[in-house]
From Swiss-Prot:
Intracellular or extracellular location(s): Cytoplasm
Gene3D superfamilies, alphabetized: P-loop containing nucleotide triphosphate hydrolases (3.40.50.300)
Taxonomic lineage from the root: Bacteria, Bacillati, Actinomycetota, Actinomycetes, Micrococcales
Gene that this polypeptide is encoded by: ureG
One Pfam family hit: cobW
A GO molecular-function descriptor: nickel cation binding
GO biological process: urea catabolic process
SUPFAM superfamilies associated with the record: P-loop containing nucleoside triphosphate hydrolases (SSF52540)
Protein name, as recorded: Urease accessory protein UreG
GO cellular component, one term: cytoplasm
Binding residues for GTP: G10, P11, V12, G13, A14, G15, K16, T17
Main localization of the protein described in the UniProt heading: cytoplasm
Function per UniProt: Facilitates the functional incorporation of the urease nickel metallocenter. This process requires GTP hydrolysis, probably effectuated by UreG.
Family to which this protein belongs: Belongs to the SIMIBI class G3E GTPase family. UreG subfamily.
């Protein structure tokens, strides 16, 4: 059975790499995983994952996309597709491959030909009105995450406002609030992977 491909998108600094690091660490005993990172001119995120993640270095592939990072996850996904095939051949037991996009704007989305499910992550420091802007990444993702909840008091963000706005544009689609620095809310994301992603794939 092919692994499930989960895309992770969001602006620069929102916590995409940290989310992959935390998920792979927390779920390493139950799921066989690998990760692909997309950066414009470097493979810095892949290097960070190699240092901080429990994933062996050979299970992490860094891609230098050049130009606009959203092109590699939507218009021309060939580099990511090649990396996925490389990981599948190298590790036949893989159950989940995370594809982290380069930092991009609120409208960036993954091609449905590339990923099976997508996560879009923002952080509280971008302001409580961000969910109200309802960019395509936030609307169309299978899971929406508001990260760095611990910063709310320092940036004047009201989490209850962000939650109510998220409910409006997400409708029946799930969303979560996290502080990945302490793993607060990570259990919600892991349950989503277990119940919505892996169980759906079995179905």
């Amino acid at each position: 059975m092919d692994p499930v491909i989960i895309g992770i998108g969001g602006p620069v600094g929102a916590g995409k790499t940290q989310l992959v690091e935390r998920l792979t660490r927390a779920m390493s005993e139950e799921i066989s995983m690998a990760a692909i990172t997309n950066d414009i001119y470097t493979i810095e995120d892949a290097k960070i994952l190699s240092r901080t993640s429990v994933l062996p270095e050979e299970r992490i592939v860094g891609i230098e996309t050049g130009g606009c990072p959203h092109t590699a996850i939507r218009e021309d996904t060939s580099m990511n597709e090649a990396a996925i095939e490389q990981l599948k051949a190298r590790f036949p037991d893989l159950q989940v491959i995370f594809v982290e996009s380069g930092g991009d704007n609120l409208s960036a989305t993954f091609s449905p030909e590339l990923v099976d499910f997508s996560i879009y992550i923002i952080d509280v420091a971008q302001g409580e009105k961000i969910p109200r802007k309802a960019g395509q990444g936030m609307i169309k993702s299978d899971l929406f995450i508001v990260n760095k909840t611990d910063l709310a008091p320092y940036v004047g963000a009201d989490l209850s406002v962000m939650e109510s706005d998220s409910k409006v544009f997400r409708k029946d689609r799930p969303f979560a609030f996290t502080n990945l620095k302490t793993d607060e809310g990570l259990d919600v994301v892991m349950d989503w992977i277990r119940n919505d992603v892996l169980m759906a794939d079995l179905g």
